[in-house]
Amino acid sequence: MAGTKPGDLGQVKVGQYVVIDGIACRVMDTAHSKPGKHGGAKVRMVAVGIFEPVKKEYVGPAGSRIDIPLIDKRKGQVLALMGDQVQIMDMESFETLEIPMPEDVEGIESGAEVEYFEAMDRYKITRVIGK
């Protein structure tokens, strides 16, 4: 599963995922403001990229649409550690994937079970489940 779906900007909450400038991001802060008597409400959003640690800001009308990435969370088993890459076998489809080694997840070793997700044709290991 990959790609995006449209969502309502005014309904986005902290912790959800959005696409800003083609980058899948996790929303860290939102603020709604109504500028005046005849103006429409605006939403200011601060988000951090899922795959790159880049901070993004977005401001738009509360009634507008924003892309929401389709995220597929899965479990896999680590087959091999190859430098800055990790080879994983998906536990459902048994396909093998090469995913970049995450800097913020500890305990990744051969044979460990991990949780990873796919968003917009990219993969990331989120945590180690067991060994």
From Swiss-Prot:
Single Gene Ontology MF annotation: translation elongation factor activity
GO biological process: positive regulation of translational elongation; positive regulation of translational termination
Pfam families (alphabetical): IF5A-like_N
Record-linked SMART domains: eIF-5a (SM01376)
Protein name as it appears in the record: Translation initiation factor 5A
UniProt source species: Methanococcus vannielii (strain ATCC 35089 / DSM 1224 / JCM 13029 / OCM 148 / SB)
UniProt keyword terms in alphabetical order: Cytoplasm, Hypusine, Initiation factor, Protein biosynthesis
Cellular compartments annotated: Cytoplasm
Function: Functions by promoting the formation of the first peptide bond.
UniProt record similarity statement: Belongs to the eIF-5A family.
Entry GO CC: cytoplasm
Modified-residue entries (Hypusine), positions: 37
Stored SUPFAM superfamilies: Nucleic acid-binding proteins, Translation proteins SH3-like domain
Lineage: Archaea, Methanobacteriati, Methanobacteriota, Methanomada group, Methanococci
PROSITE patterns recorded: IF5A_HYPUSINE
Record bears the keyword Amino-acid biosynthesis: no
Entry keyword GTP-binding: no
